[in-house]
């Protein structure tokens, strides 16, 4: 998908993170004035694991885009950016339950490291299921998000809301499952509503 880009940053010494982390990603000049220029800073998920030796940031850049993404689009290898306030908001929960990863579009990038972490060490996770909706049908990371019964991993991609929410309702039959949701605010609200109706509690 030509709109989706992954930027790989060299890892500064001693910089580490867990799967499911996000960071503040700042472009050059964000702190040049009296006050930080917030339009040059974005909250971004890290789409890699530390053992990949690079900090990956995956984002969708459309033709019409913000100042931030316009600058990002023109960055070249060797250009500098700043990262700060990095912390994990969705580490993989190991509670002997089934884990469901619900995402929209490029939100899937947040789950890439969780899946890799699960493949490396499946302790105390029964199985994992990913469901991603992308209306462009240009599905992401299909090398990793690929059903592998021997790893107890299933990956589903759908391109419309009807199929997506029907599938979520089916998954919600597992009242004991752990559900992760990543996408726009509207996507989160809709998913939480569907899950609650099915009796899944936060």
Please give the residue ranges for each predicted region.
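Ferredoxin-reductase
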Residues: 1-77, 134
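FNR/FR-type flavoprotein reductase catalytic core
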Residues: 58, 64-202
């Amino acid at each position: 998908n030509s709109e989706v880009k992954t930027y790989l940053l060299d890892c500064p010494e001693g910089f580490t993170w867990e799967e499911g982390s996000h960071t503040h990603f700042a472009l050059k000049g964000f702190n040049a004035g009296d006050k930080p220029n917030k339009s040059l800073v974005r909250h971004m998920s890290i789409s890699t694991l530390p053992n990949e030796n690079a900090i990956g940031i995956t984002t969708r850049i459309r033709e019409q885009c913000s100042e931030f993404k316009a600058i990002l689009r023109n960055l070249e290898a060797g250009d500098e950016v700043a990262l700060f306030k990095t912390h994990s908001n969705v580490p993989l929960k190991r509670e002997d339950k089934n884990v469901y990863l619900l995402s929209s579009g490029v939100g899937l990038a947040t789950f890439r490291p969780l899946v890799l972490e699960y493949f490396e060490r499946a302790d105390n996770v029964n199985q994992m299921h990913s469901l991603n909706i992308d209306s462009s049908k240009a599905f992401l990371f299909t090398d990793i998000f690929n059903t592998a019964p021997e790893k107890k991993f299933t990956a589903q991609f759908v391109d419309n809301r009807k199929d997506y929410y029907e599938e979520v309702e089916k998954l919600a039959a597992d009242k004991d499952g752990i559900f992760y949701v990543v996408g726009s605010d509207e996507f989160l609200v809709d998913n939480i509503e569907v899950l609650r109706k099915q009796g899944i509690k936060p």
